[in-house]
């Protein structure tokens, strides 16, 4: 079974994170390790998650010169992560170099995903960094660039999923943050949708954090979400 739920681990300590992880089941979700936890806890923490049979999405959003990003992606592959991402605005050459370095790994290579427009960003945010386009227009532009580079898919908000399916086809993976079960606080993300809605319009993987990690019974919430999208 291809788990569609990716739980974002946003904890301050290893003990807190592992306490949560030990309450959930790798058959029900994958786990995302971001910049804060990876900077604090490093590869040892990732290996602890893998030892518990969880697939890991290493969410470090690489953005640097091509060789530096490629070597970082290779290190992620050597670590055995399931998915790794980079910023599409790093350009075509950066993404192509990262994809090429994964070729020797074959079927064991992690999924390589492009980050398009962060879900916290709106039209004004883009304009302030010199991009005179809507989030939708910029996502489409960057998704095309990712596809041209040979990436496996992109991170995009739920509102862009249907358009990207049309532009990029059914085999291009769409990883969707901004997912909040009904009744949840939207937090710092503005372009949001429920799990059921996102799957129905074609999302492949749903990134969900606090509604699961801060729940009194995270396993029950996880089971409920999985049931809603079954």
Curated annotation (Swiss-Prot):
Spell out the subunit comment: Homodimer.
Q: Which organism does this sequence originate in?
A: Glaesserella parasuis serovar 5 (strain SH0165) (Haemophilus parasuis)
**CDD domains membership:** OMP_decarboxylase_like
Please name the InterPro entries in this protein's record: Aldolase_TIM, OMPdecase, OMPdecase_AS, OMPdecase_bac, OMPdeCOase_dom, RibuloseP-bd_barrel
Gene name of this polypeptide: pyrF
The family this protein is said to belong to: Belongs to the OMP decarboxylase family. Type 1 subfamily.
**Which Pfam families does this entry report, sorted A to Z?**
OMPdecase
UniProt-annotated catalytic positions: 61 (proton donor)
Q: Which reaction does it catalyse?
A: orotidine 5'-phosphate + H(+) = UMP + CO2
Name of the molecule in the record: Orotidine 5'-phosphate decarboxylase
The pathway that the record names for this protein is: Pyrimidine metabolism; UMP biosynthesis via de novo pathway; UMP from orotate: step 2/2
Specify whether Acyltransferase is a keyword of the entry: no
Give the GO cellular component terms, alphabetically: cytosol
The protein's UniProt keywords, in alphabetical order, are: Decarboxylase, Lyase, Pyrimidine biosynthesis
């Amino acid at each position: 079974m291809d788990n569609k739920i990716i739980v974002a681990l946003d904890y301050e300590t290893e003990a807190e994170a592992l306490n949560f992880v030990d309450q959930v089941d790798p058959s029900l979700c994958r786990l995302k390790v971001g910049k804060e936890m990876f900077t604090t806890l490093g590869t040892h923490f990732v290996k602890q998650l893998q030892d518990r049979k969880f697939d890991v999405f290493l969410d470090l959003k690489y953005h640097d010169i091509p060789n530096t990003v490629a070597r970082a992606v290779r290190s992620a592959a050597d670590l055995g992560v399931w998915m790794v991402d980079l910023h599409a605005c790093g350009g075509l050459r950066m993404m192509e170099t990262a994809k090429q370095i994964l070729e020797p790994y074959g079927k064991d290579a992690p999924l390589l995903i492009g980050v398009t427009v962060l879900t916290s960003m709106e039209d004004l945010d883009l304009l302030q960094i010199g991009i005179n386009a809507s989030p939708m227009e910029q996502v489409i532009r960057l998704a095309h660039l990712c596809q041209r580079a040979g990436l496996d898919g992109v991170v995009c908000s739920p509102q862009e999923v249907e358009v990207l399916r049309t532009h990029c086809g059914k085999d291009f993976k769409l990883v969707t943050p901004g997912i909040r079960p009904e009744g949840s606080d939207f937090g710092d993300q503005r372009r949001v949708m429920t799990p059921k809605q996102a799957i129905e319009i074609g999302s492949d993987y749903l990134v969900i954090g606090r509604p699961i990690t801060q729940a009194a019974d995270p396993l029950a919430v996880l089971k409920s979400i999985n049931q809603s999208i079954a």
